[in-house]
UniProtKB/Swiss-Prot annotation:
Pfam families: Gliadin. Belongs to the gliadin/glutenin family. GO terms for molecular function: nutrient reservoir activity. Glutenins are coded by several genes on each of the group 1 chromosomes of wheat. This is Glutenin, low molecular weight subunit. It comes from Triticum aestivum (Wheat).
């Protein structure tokens, strides 16, 4: 009996396997006919949805092992196996295949193909072939022309601006720079050190007088001029070579300032004398009416523009430095480096300054 039951079960299992194989052989054409579009268009979902059931259907030994105990109940096996095949395959092909064609294929053609043609092709053709960019470029060119027309006047106006700005730079920057070169600033210790040179140059600031002094110094070696000359040369040699030129200019500038102070004192004395004479000449009855012309006279006598004073100082400085640089280096056998100045010297006075 047991062997008969075993053979019967084996026969049933073989029959069910043959039925399943026949059904599977009939199903692949549908899957082969319908899988390529799904594999081409929707491979991931179709492979996930259909391969899993086929793998479950092909793996019969576990299914047979799980359902071998209920093989004794043949009707449930047919009821359990047949309905799933009818319910699993037909709904899958009806629900999974038909909707994909209607929902998955049609939308891709409508969403994937049509939008690309509408979004990818039409915009590029509209952007590349349409005339708005050309019109924008033409508008930009048309706008650039007014910009060039608007910018050309500033460019044409900029040269006068540069012409207007350059003179102030020449007037504001260069003179101070030249003044910084021309009006030297040196420590009082150096001035004290070169005081003999200052005294020597104060006595002989005129070229003719300097030549006379040099002649006298040659004739009378023990004179005051010769003593001051020796002291000046000694002090000048102690100063570094780079600062010798500036120190000489500083000495000359101090001489010019002393001369101006003396001139101002003389002018003030003359002004005071003229005011006293004017007051003595005017009658006392005029009272306050006399005070106004007196103030005007004081202002007229005291007014001297600073620019004229500076120009006069610079001219004197250049003339006297040229004379000093001709005499002192040769007299003391001292090297004085070249020092360029930007100011113009009056005609007839040559500045032959070089490296001695």
């Amino acid at each position: 009996m047991k062997t008969f039951l075993v053979f019967a079960l084996l026969a049933l299992a073989a029959a069910s396997a043959v039925a399943q194989i026949s059904q599977q052989q009939q199903a692949p054409p549908f899957s082969q006919q319908q899988q390529p579009p799904f594999s081409q268009q929707q491979q991931p979902p179709f492979s996930q949805q259909q391969q899993s059931p086929f793998s479950q259907q092909q793996q019969q030994p576990p299914f047979a092992q799980q359902q071998q105990p209920p093989f004794s109940q043949q009707p449930p096996i047919s009821q359990q196996q047949q309905p799933p095949f009818s319910q699993q395959q037909q709904p899958q092909f009806s629900q999974q295949q038909q909707p994909p064609y209607s929902q998955q294929q049609q939308p891709p053609y409508s969403q994937q193909q049509q939008p690309p043609f509408s979004q990818q092709q039409q915009p590029p053709f509209s952007q590349q072939q349409q005339q708005p960019p050309f019109t924008q470029q033409q508008q930009q060119q048309q706008q650039q022309q007014p910009f060039t027309q608007q910018q050309q006047p500033p460019f044409s106006q900029q040269p006068p601006i540069s012409q207007q700005q350059q003179p102030p730079f020449l007037q504001q920057q260069r003179p101070p720079f030249s003044r910084q070169q021309q009006i030297p600033v040196i420590h009082p210790s150096v001035l004290q050190q070169l005081n003999p040179c200052k005294v020597f140059l104060q006595q002989q600031c005129i070229p003719v007088a300097m030549q006379r002094c040099l002649a006298r110094s040659q004739m009378l070696q023990q004179s005051i001029c010769h003593v001051m000359q020796q002291q000046c040369c000694q002090q000048l040699r102690q100063i570094p070579e780079q600062s010798r030129h500036e120190s000489i200019r500083a000495i000359i500038y101090s001489i010019i300032l002393q001369q101006q102070q003396q001139q101002q004192q003389q002018q003030q004395q003359q002004q005071g004398q003229s005011i006293i004479q004017y007051q003595q000449q005017q009658p006392q009855q005029l009272g306050q009416c006399v005070s106004q012309p007196l103030q005007q006279l004081q202002q007229q006598l005291g007014q001297q523009p600073q620019q004229q004073q500076l120009a006069h100082q610079i001219a004197q400085l250049e003339v006297m430095t040229s004379i000093a640089l001709r005499t002192l280096p040769t007299m003391c056998n001292v090297n004085v480096p070249l020092y360029e100045t930007t100011t113009s010297v009056p005609l007839g006075v040559g500045i032959g300054v070089g490296v001695y």
